[in-house]
Amino acid sequence: MLGDENGEMSTIPGLNQIQFEGFCGFMDRGLTEELYKFPKIEDTEQEIEFQLFVETYQLVEPLIKERDAVYESLTYSSELYVSAGLIWKTSKDMQEQTIFIGNIPLMNSLGTSIVNGIYRIVINQILQSPGIYYRSELDHNGISVYTGTIISDWGGRLELEIDRKARIWARVSRKQKISILVLSSAMGSNLREILENVCYPEIFLSFLTDKEKKKIGSKENAILEFYQQFSCVGGDPVFSESLCKELQKKFFQQRCELGRIGRRNMNQRLNLNIPQNNTFLLPRDILAAADRLIGMKFGMGPLDDMNHLKNKRIRSVADLLQDQFGLALVRLENVVRGTICGAIRHKLIPTPQNLVTSTPLTTTYESFFGLHPLSQVLDRTNPLTQIVHGRKLSYLGPGGLTGRTANFRIRDIHPSHYGRICPIDTSEGINVGLIGSLAIHARIGHWGSLESPFYKIFERSKKAQMLYLSPSRDEYYMVAAGNSLALNQGIQEEQVVPARYRQEFLTIAWEQVHLRSIFPFQYFSIGASLIPFIEHNDANRALMSSNMQRQAVPLSRSEKCIVGTGLERQVALDSGVPAIADHEGKIISTDTDKIILSGNGDALGIPLVMYQRSNKNTCMHQTARVRRGKCIKKGQILADGAATVGGELALGKNVLVAYMPWEGYNFEDAVLISERLVYEDIYTSFHIRKYEIQTHVTSQGPERITNEIPHLEAHLLRNLDKNGIVMLGSWVETGDILVGKLTPQVAKESSYAPEDRLLRAILGIQVSTSKETCLKLPIGGRGRVIDVRWVQKKGGSSYNPETIRVYISQKREIKVGDKVAGRHGNKGIISKILPRQDMPYLQDGRPVDMVFNPLGVPSRMNVGQLFECSLGLAGSLLDRHYRIAPFDERYEQEASRKLVFSELYQASKQTANPWVFEPEYPGKSRIFDGRTGGPFEQPVIIGKPYILKLIHQVDDKIHGRSSGHYALVTQQPLRGRSKQGGQRVGEMEVWALEGFGVAHILQEMLTYKSDHIRARQEVLGTTIIGGTIPKPEDAPESFRLLVRELRSLALELNHFLVSEKNFQINRKEA
């Protein structure tokens, strides 16, 4: 909670609130809006009418719990029932029944949906808001061309242009344009109405030729001219009903449907008063837009900034779910219409329940959550990742931009983003600037705009009122960027403050300020708000840090950060990872898997998460924090989850770090660590991998799960039970059988034994054999089996195969090749693990845990890590934890450095260690070489920063290939670890071998051992038995491929092979 002595209190909103509000909006409004749009359906002879009674719809509570839905791979959904009536018009009888329409996936307490047992989340999308936008561009002659673009609710565009002669055209396609008079006439206006409704009728009359008068003489002529230009049809088309329908479908529906947001924007921009329920583009809109375009041509009125947030709208979870619900109802309408016609044709008596099926709604939502680009699998690497994923904003997706076509201006930061979209947190790579993150206090307004809170300042009162403003409103106010805490120290009226006004950053007097920001974190996302001393870091490094915190692996023993920002508790609580008491009571008993709580005379069991796998293979586990007999209050923490301690986010460890070079082992961001981090399990994490296999019914018979697998060693089957499934608690190694499975197949005639052939010849018995298709543990999967699930979908047909899933837990210590990072973009790879006695040690004898490269600080300009490092050392010595808000220089100059030095001085004084703070080089200390015992030449910065272990681990990346699969066309090795691929020699390796002049080795690498089909088989044999490698006399596949590609370009390449024996030239075809 954020306080202000002059005003009301401001609380940071729930970090999942944007997801909850979207889903509630769909349930409250979107569902009924789409149901009301469902039409009355009649048969062809208009004897029967079917309709829905929307007022009585109901959603049933789910039959299963969230945890069971995940375990059994089901969808956590609610059944939708609506009353429907079937009316016979001849007898005026009505039959009313409650019908089941389908299942709607529900949102759980984390703001996610569970579909087929998988946590999925829907991302909010940023789209261009429907309306009209004016802009100016230079043509090839350097003359300004003014255009007005009307964007529809579907994303279609209609462009109005004005040429040098002040004639106005509407562009209907890339190459074709028509006069605005023809377009207005085709939409139903006559010439008199056009001239009465424009401000510049003389300009319209100036380009009205006799030919134009003929075209707009009647509505039919105008429609024919419009159709001819739009469809590029030659000759003289004839006016007909089908022609009008085609125009309506291909042009007007796509480009002229504004929607309620577009209608509001159109009215505001053109000063119109057309009713909000009229969401279609009218001739009056076209004429008003043309008038404004003429004014733009003569310098009247401002142009529009397409990248301003007031010209964008958020397509929220509610909009996406409502669109899918509407699509499902359209499909349902077609099904009902077809069923009614079929029943009448076969002279059957239909009922409402017989007409409606639940398939359209259920399949529509399943395909949406499974295939839509904005529906993503929830990233559950750690609690922070879960929260941040639901607050993403994407320009990508249907109706949006693509990473290839988006220009730099769209990706760049805009002044209207402040307080709404984080200027730091975005993706790296091709999607930079296209995927952003919502600022902490921002929310989605009623019209799809992003709103940010401000304090309104009154002249004669010290009270401040908080209000939320959309991007179009805060432009008219002077918004002070600083916080009032700095102003309270002196006389406010005499102070000058930085402010933002109309997309410019100014410095103005305090009495001119209208609004001020409510909190320094207001401009940042959650990831950026967790970086202490962020104001001392370069923005690029802050971006990397906010991304890398989401990649941190939960450790086996988590630890709170000494230096934080104060947001760690809310992130942990809103993530839903810790177990929280719903009401007060007394703890009866605690166990590893549940806590029993008594309250109001009832005993309530609270289940805990036990070794649950996330989709990034990290371990989600809860540990009880309360003891038996303790009285607790509502909202108190009962159990910590993965990466939380005491209800606070704990992603890493506070370790002793020195910034110094050490024998080149921290060259280029490499990190040297002590073996203490390995042996004391400081950075040990648990990972859970899932392996699954399915059993199908083949044409030869069903596949069998069994422990009797022929032709396999008993050692590989040692962990299987009598059913052929691995036993719980077994330790499995690479190559072990997890599930034994036999697939039936018919053997070839030649493979039958003589007695089998006799049986076939005499009795006609088909002897079947089985092929071993067991689930084997792949390379790098060794570990302990912690769970086995046998999942069988309802129905039991061959289309619903049985699935067996085996979960294996791995304990991973930190090792050479793992990636670690701080919270300031300082990342590195472990290069060497040194014995603790060889590590540099402090003056009190303690060896450091990590050695970082000091050259990683000045060029990267992330000095915040040095402040955190020194303050962490002071906090560990004083046993204190610090929570520091950013931009503390608003209190006084050098506030961060003064705080760090004062705490170091106090720690030095309290612990009687003068080396902690030495005035000659504050923050630095002389340390000693563990190998020699002598001091290093220069004093070194030492401290305790918060270091994270990231998901990029060497066990998942390291890969080697001795033999494997080849591509069929090129005969080159496949690419990637998952395909057991790997090109042995690349271009740069060839250069290196060329530099050494090793021609024979190079020839072997590029031909015999690579893509010569016959030679590579012989090479393998000679390598095993010993001997010389045979040299083939024909070309390798890569050369043959080159010849074929040249041949496809009509270039014939004749090649000759020179024999080494008699130097004869033998011509061979490729």
Swiss-Prot record:
GO biological process: DNA-templated transcription
Record field: catalytic activity: RNA(n) + a ribonucleoside 5'-triphosphate = RNA(n+1) + diphosphate
Molecular function as annotated in GO: DNA binding; DNA-directed RNA polymerase activity; ribonucleoside binding
Location of the protein in the cell: Plastid, Chloroplast
Disulfide bridge partners, by residue number: none
Domain of life: Eukaryota
CDD domains assigned: RNA_pol_B_RPB2
Pfam families (alphabetical): RNA_pol_Rpb2_2, RNA_pol_Rpb2_3, RNA_pol_Rpb2_6, RNA_pol_Rpb2_7
One GO CC term on file: chloroplast
Enzyme Commission number: 2.7.7.6
Listed InterPro entries: DNA-dir_RNA_pol_bsu_ext_1_sf, DNA-dir_RNA_pol_su2, DNA-dir_RNAP_su2_dom, DNA-dir_RNAP_su2_hyb_sf, RNA_pol_bsu_bac, RNA_pol_bsu_CS, RNA_pol_Rpb2_2, RNA_pol_Rpb2_2_sf
Protein keywords: Chloroplast, DNA-directed RNA polymerase, Nucleotidyltransferase, Plastid, Transcription, Transferase
Main localization, broad class: plastid
Residues annotated as signal peptide: none
Quaternary structure, from the entry: In plastids the minimal PEP RNA polymerase catalytic core is composed of four subunits: alpha, beta, beta', and beta''. When a (nuclear-encoded) sigma factor is associated with the core the holoenzyme is formed, which can initiate transcription.
Family designation: Belongs to the RNA polymerase beta chain family.
Function text: DNA-dependent RNA polymerase catalyzes the transcription of DNA into RNA using the four ribonucleoside triphosphates as substrates.
Name of the molecule in the record: DNA-directed RNA polymerase subunit beta
UniProt organism field: Gossypium hirsutum (Upland cotton)
Gene transcribed to yield this protein: rpoB
